[in-house]
Amino acid sequence: MRNFLSNLFLFLLLYSCQENLDFQKNKESIYDYNADEISGSPIRISISEGKADIYKIVSDTLLDSLGNILLYGGVGIEVFDQEGKKTNDVFSNRAIVYTQSDSMSAYGNVMAVSAFNGYRLYTEKIILYNDTKLVKSNNEVLFVRDNDSLRGVGFWSDFDMVHWKIDKPIGLIEKGENE
């Protein structure tokens, strides 16, 4: 009897582990999940246009809200151009991916770093417009280039932060020859 119970327990344990593996194995898209909220440590997703990745995102929590994707907790976003070359990294507390346009907003302790030149932007909110490949913020920003920094309100830039503008600057910064 004891041997039978041991075998039964072992069988149930192995069966439940196998079922859990099957559940996780076939999830290739967020649409494969039934729940509106997915938590993980971390969740990794890619958003593509055709065969090219637009964004590669890491986050602690993903929430589907009326077709848009809400991301919470330690959001890291790699942004790519149409050739698949990384243009920048964006880090924030939370973000929203607008699925109709593939544009994105990042909120809370936002830092954007250009992969092209290492320039950094700090603010509380930015919007990444995928169709025009522009970055915008209406908030106060701190832009850091090499050893220079400039504060201001309002910011426009291309994705790789080569061509940028602060709408209402506070202070001075020297632009390089290629900017």
What spans do the regions from the language model cover?
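Mature-chain termini and adjacent capping regions
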Residues: 1-179
